Swiss-Prot record:
Chief location category: cytoplasm
InterPro entries on file: GLR_AS (IPR011767), GLRX1 (IPR047185), Glutaredoxin (IPR002109), Glutaredoxin_euk/vir (IPR011899), Glutaredoxin_subgr (IPR014025), Thioredoxin-like_sf (IPR036249)
Function: Has a glutathione-disulfide oxidoreductase activity in the presence of NADPH and glutathione reductase. Reduces low molecular weight disulfides and proteins.
Protein name: Glutaredoxin-1
Modified residues (N6-succinyllysine): 9
Compartments where located: Cytoplasm
Positions where N-acetylalanine occurs in the chain: 2
Molecular function terms from GO: glutathione disulfide oxidoreductase activity
Lineage: Eukaryota, Metazoa, Chordata, Craniata, Vertebrata
Keyword annotations from UniProtKB, A to Z: Acetylation, Cytoplasm, Disulfide bond, Electron transport, Redox-active center, Transport
Gene3D superfamilies, A to Z: Glutaredoxin (3.40.30.10)
Disulfide links within the chain: 23-26, 79-83
């Protein structure tokens, strides 16, 4: 169930962030990404606490990415890590480049 749920969310050309709403790093990630000019429907925040499978989802994220912490940020099918990784990419100018490469920005 958790594996199918996660896999259904991760898609090429889209940015998906698995979050918990009470997590300060998740909120920071949401703030950063929400400031960028995404095309409609190509940025999705998935609240993993809204399901009864929160632990299973985190276990599968661990299998998939090497970490079960949130946020887990996927650009297309690739996990780039969490909040700190996203901020580093943004500071280096790599984030906008990657988002343009997958066609996610207006």
């Amino acid at each position: 169930m958790a594996q199918a749920f996660v896999n259904s969310k991760i898609q090429p050309g889209k940015v998906v962030v698995f979050i918990k709403p009470t997590c300060p790093f998740c909120r920071k990630t949401q703030e950063l990404l929400s400031q960028l000019p995404f095309k409609e429907g190509l940025l999705e925040f998935v609240d993993i606490t809204a399901t009864s499978d929160t632990n299973e989802i985190q276990d599968y994220l661990q299998q998939l990415t090497g970490a079960r912490t949130v946020p887990r940020v996927f650009i297309g099918k690739e996990c780039i890590g969490g909040c700190t990784d996203l901020e580093s990419m943004h500071k280096r100018g790599e984030l906008l480049t990657r988002l343009q490469q997958i066609g996610a920005l207006k």
